């Protein structure tokens, strides 16, 4: 414990000199084109938060996340949105998650649905999704959605209503990998954030193959 830790120093994590040298050496290549380093001057690009403001001033985030056995993904996504400055956060999740999320994060807005509601009332559900999308300035889609049969339709309804930026992660990407026709709904508003395993499922390429050409694979997938 702390008694045996000795003197603790907090060091700047920084970037290894070797890493920065590798970035410089890669200039002119696909990897170099996407390698960016930031300095103190770049902090000035972050907009100042006005003092004369309210929670509606700082954006509305709709998070479509969580399933019966994975409410933590929804909770952590919403908490992260608040901690990075979002003014209003709404969670669209399954009904089973309502109570625990209201207890753990009472400041969040909860909009709940049931898988049966989605599967049996497609048109009504689609109208509900459209209304939620009109409310939002940005959407997060995927964390902890699971792989139930209804997830395909949920992802489709979000993508067809994507008039604001939509960040797709985790099970949202898995649904797209399992149902490739969903990529036909991609627009300039869609941002995907796959890890290596998810990228392998999306592209059909092996993980080792992707590792050898990370930037190139991303560029090719982006079209």
Q: What is the role of each PLM region?
A:
Residues 2-167, 174-192, 196-223:
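Small-residue (G/A/S/T)-rich helix-start motifs and N-terminal tracts that mark the onset
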């Amino acid at each position: 414990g702390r008694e045996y830790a000795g003197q603790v120093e907090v060091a700047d994590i920084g970037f290894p000199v070797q890493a920065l040298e590798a970035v410089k050496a890669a200039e002119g290549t696909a990897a170099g084109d996407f390698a960016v380093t930031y300095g103190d001057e770049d902090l000035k690009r972050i907009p100042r938060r006005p003092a004369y403001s309210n929670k509606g001033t700082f954006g509305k985030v709709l998070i479509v996340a969580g399933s019966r056995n994975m409410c933590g993904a929804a909770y952590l996504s919403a908490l992260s949105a608040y901690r990075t400055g979002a003014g209003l956060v709404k969670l669209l999740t399954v009904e089973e998650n309502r109570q625990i999320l209201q207890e753990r994060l009472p400041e969040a807005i909860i909009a709940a649905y049931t898988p049966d509601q989605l599967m049996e009332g497609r048109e009504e559900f689609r109208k509900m999704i459209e209304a939620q999308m009109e409310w939002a300035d940005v959407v997060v889609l995927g964390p902890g959605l699971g792989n139930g049969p209804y997830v395909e339709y949920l992802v489709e309804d979000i993508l067809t209503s994507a008039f604001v930026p939509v960040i797709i992660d985790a099970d949202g990407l898995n649904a797209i990998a399992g149902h490739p026709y969903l990529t036909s709904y991609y627009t300039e508003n869609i941002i995907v954030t796959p890890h290596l395993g998810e990228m392998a499922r999306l592209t059909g390429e092996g993980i080792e193959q992707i590792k050898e050409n990370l930037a190139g694979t991303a560029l090719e997938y982006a079209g």
